[in-house]
């Protein structure tokens, strides 16, 4: 029986062979974010649909992802579709994250702020995260002016957030 762990482990092994672990890790995060942007589940529904043939789904994957993701990740999506297990894609990616973080003894994080951080601020954040995760941290920064002020730190398994936008959402939810 095929399971998500087997797909996740296979993706990890391929990414290691191709020396693209970090790139595929980032692409997996982007892909999951993309899947969540389809709030109605339409992308997942389409790729799990019985109305489309497997060759149609493969063409769709090529059309949607080939120019935006590395070939290893696109091939991973194709294999999981051809085997008829696209419903497991999110779980498989989570197993991939687990493999990367445990095998490489690193934690990937994305630091999102409303403004650019100084190297001193960045070093302080990294030191805090390494202490918290008890492992080496590899990071990527991003600026999101909609945060207004504050910070958001994302990893595969944690979310740390303290910003004005988040506070405003909580206040508005209280009144609605």
Swiss-Prot record:
GO molecular-function terms, A-Z: proton-transporting ATP synthase activity, rotational mechanism
PANTHER family attached to this UniProt entry: ATP SYNTHASE DELTA CHAIN (PTHR11910)
Subcellular location: Cell membrane
NCBIfam families: ATP_synt_delta
Subunit field text: F-type ATPases have 2 components, F(1) - the catalytic core - and F(0) - the membrane proton channel. F(1) has five subunits: alpha(3), beta(3), gamma(1), delta(1), epsilon(1). F(0) has three main subunits: a(1), b(2) and c(10-14). The alpha and beta chains form an alternating ring which encloses part of the gamma chain. F(1) is attached to F(0) by a central stalk formed by the gamma and epsilon chains, while a peripheral stalk is formed by the delta and b chains.
Taxonomic classification: Bacteria, Bacillati, Mycoplasmatota, Mycoplasmoidales, Mycoplasmoidaceae
Function: F(1)F(0) ATP synthase produces ATP from ADP in the presence of a proton or sodium gradient. F-type ATPases consist of two structural domains, F(1) containing the extramembraneous catalytic core and F(0) containing the membrane proton channel, linked together by a central stalk and a peripheral stalk. During catalysis, ATP synthesis in the catalytic domain of F(1) is coupled via a rotary mechanism of the central stalk subunits to proton translocation.
Protein name: ATP synthase subunit delta
Family per similarity comment: Belongs to the ATPase delta chain family.
Main location: membrane
Pfam families: OSCP (PF00213)
Gene name for this UniProt entry: atpH
Coiled-coil regions listed: none
A single BP term in Gene Ontology: proton motive force-driven ATP synthesis
GO cellular component assignments: plasma membrane; proton-transporting ATP synthase complex
Top-level taxonomic group: Bacteria
Keywords: ATP synthesis, Cell membrane, CF(1), Hydrogen ion transport, Ion transport, Membrane, Transport
InterPro entries given in the database record: ATP_synth_OSCP/delta_N_sf (IPR026015), ATPase_OSCP/d_CS (IPR020781), ATPase_OSCP/dsu (IPR000711)
Membrane-protein topology: Peripheral membrane protein
């Amino acid at each position: 029986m095929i399971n998500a762990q087997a797909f996740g482990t296979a993706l990890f092994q391929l990414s290691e062979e191709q020396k693209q672990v970090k790139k595929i890790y980032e692409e997996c995060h982007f892909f999951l974010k993309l899947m969540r942007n389809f709030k109605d589940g339409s992308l997942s529904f389409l790729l799990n649909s019985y109305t489309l043939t497997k060759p149609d789904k493969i063409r769709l994957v090529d059309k949607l992802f080939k120019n935006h993701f590395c070939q290893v990740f696109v091939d991973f999506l194709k294999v999981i579709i051809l085997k008829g297990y696209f419903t497991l894609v999110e779980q498989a990616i989570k197993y991939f994250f687990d493999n990367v973080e445990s095998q490489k003894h690193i934690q990937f994080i994305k630091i999102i702020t409303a403004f650019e951080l100084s190297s001193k601020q960045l070093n302080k954040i990294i030191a805090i995260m390494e202490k918290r995760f008890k492992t080496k941290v590899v990071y990527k920064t991003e600026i999101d002016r909609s945060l207004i002020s504050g910070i958001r730190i994302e990893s595969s398994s944690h979310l740390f957030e303290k910003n004005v936008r988040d506070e405003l959402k909580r206040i508005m939810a209280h009144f609605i």
